[in-house]
């Protein structure tokens, strides 16, 4: 110190240098930190969610395009200084040039190129800033992001606040409101699962980079849960979504959707799911670093969210949630009912990195009960009741109970059981799901239920067997029964397909195909026997074992064999 004091020239030099250093930041002349964008204020950058955002007015660009970039602050906040650059995604080098018109902004030279960056001219308070960026007219261009350093005060600043990615397409296509789809490698990945992030996938432990039919989500949360990196991946033609829920049912959930807009580009949306209708789309909020891709039919997204997770329409105070994956189709940018849904079996602590393994009880017991009741209704009681009414009216004719023939009592009893079981199955699956699942299966199931209820109502008002109009009822009753049977078989096929989404062998569908062939064979044999009887009028009606009775016995044994196989399959699904 004495040396400095004894040398007035040296003291003057130090004072001028310090003064120049301070002034250089107040007037925004910060070209020396173009690479790091880090203010030399002697303080560390903030890691909390910034109260400032940077947005672009376009989502795609080509050579020579101009993009308006806006820096905004949240209500109640202002910034004194800033530094703005455009950078290719994953690069630390600036690209393109800026132009400004306002007096509170200036252009800086970075990487030896003028107008590569924009900064402030004074430390006056600012709420919003706009600048125009012009893309290069040549060179190796790629997707870009606008990166900003916001200075709230000398010791409070945020570095590297990024906009959503702007896609280079070289064809001049621009967008106005959606996050574009980038053509990139898989952005959701296994590395870090269990060590730095929570991962949930179906099938368990599938790898989105190598597995087929893999649905995958990952969440990497900061220690105070103010920031989360979210990854989503799944085979879908419309969207993949992740939900944060307080329970295992859809409703009152915080949701992020990675789906196609009306131009076929991927967009990330923030939504709140009420469980009874299409999720309500919210403002995207503080979401940055968006990367999206479609690879081999798989939708693929990652982004950083600084939004608070909100369930039951209020901000949650916990870090434990059930994670949900949903996927399905979209139409004109609107998501449709999901065709695939998976939920963790327990709540997941987002601050505790783990690999979530769901129990083998993939399908809720009520869904399995629904499937079993439907199979029993239309592979056993319903099928047997129908074949008795068609081919066994002559067996034990004149004998019966309650004044009715045995065939009639058996037919009515079996069909009544079928309708009751169908109604129970219909109710419990809606109670379990809580909403409309979408797809062909529920439509077919509703048609089966409606026509099944019509059948006994019409039968209750039928005319006497000798009435001249009786044939009208007979034909209507038979045609409706045939329609119910066809729809029920189709519903079973589509239902089994839902159980077998990850069974590459698909054995239950093959068993159902075998059952269909078996039943067709039995009907053909019964019909041939009926025709033979009509030709041979001398056939004794009192034979101890008539051919139709033997065929009925075989029919029941075969149906039960197929039924038991499918019941076992559903039970172990």
Swiss-Prot record:
It is found in: Membrane. Heme b 2 binds at residues 411, 477. It is a multi-pass membrane protein. Disulfide bonds: none annotated. Its EC number is 1.-.-.-. Residues 213-328 form the DOMON domain. The chain crosses the membrane at residues 4-24, 369-389, 414-434, 441-461, 479-499, 506-526, 550-570. Residues 332-532 form the Cytochrome b561 domain. Binds 2 heme b groups non-covalently. InterPro entries: Cyt_b561/ferric_Rdtase_TM (IPR006593), DOMON_domain (IPR005018), Ferric-chelate_Red/DefProt (IPR051237), Reeler_dom (IPR002861), Reeler_sf (IPR042307). Its cofactor is heme b. Residues 15-181 form the Reelin domain. GO terms for molecular function: metal ion binding; oxidoreductase activity. Keywords: Electron transport, Glycoprotein, Iron, Membrane, Metal-binding, Oxidoreductase, Transmembrane, Transmembrane helix, Transport. Heme b 1 binds at residues 370, 441. GO terms for cellular component: membrane. It comes from the Eukaryota. SMART domains: B561, DoH. Belongs to the FRRS1 family. This is Putative ferric-chelate reductase 1. The lineage of its organism: Eukaryota, Metazoa, Chordata, Craniata, Vertebrata. The gene is frrs1.
